[in-house]
Amino acid sequence: CKIEYGKAIEFKTGLLKKAYERYQDPDVQDAYSTSEDFATEYNTFCKESEWLDDYALFMAGKDYFQGAPWYMWEDSLKKPTAKQKAEWMSKLAVEVEYYRFIQFLFYRQWEALKQYANDKGIKIVGDIPIFVAWDSVDVWCNKKLFDLDSKGYPKTVAGVPPDYFSATGQLWGNPLYKWSEHTKTGYEWWFKRIRHQLKLADFLRIDHFR
């Protein structure tokens, strides 16, 4: 069968927004608080997930600019100062909170699934790509770690030369890393990325790493 991803995304997004709207209802919040302290769990997740605010603002920005990639946004959000970022967080507060909420739902459900699998003696192998997408929160928040020009466009991109998979080679388009900058930080971004992924899986495979 053929999956119609557009329709699937539209359908699921509608359900997630409905779930968020219901959560904002005071009566529903009271019900959660008395049954399993859902609100406290959510607040703890938000406080302990240092990556969450940047991700939520990035996604809210994507919505605000109608899906445009970050390098085509207004300069105040394309490459914001700390003050400008705070202003956008306030301006898009409702959308930011929505993206925080659905990330919480995902992590909560994934944690339950992983625990169930582990209890049954099943280990989960995660797949972490060695490169990240140009239009991603990783690049938007860490421009100096990637080989970009002053406008945010990649100077060099990932790919492979001709091999037994493709006679003409492949151009993936992912921006390459600026390794000199990673060295200066002690590869902090990499360590954070791997540590985080190891919370989601028991083992990791670095994809396309040879």
Spans of features found by a protein language model:
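Alpha-amylase-like alpha-glycosidases and glucanotransferases acting on alpha-linked glucans and related
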Residues: 1-107, 132-210
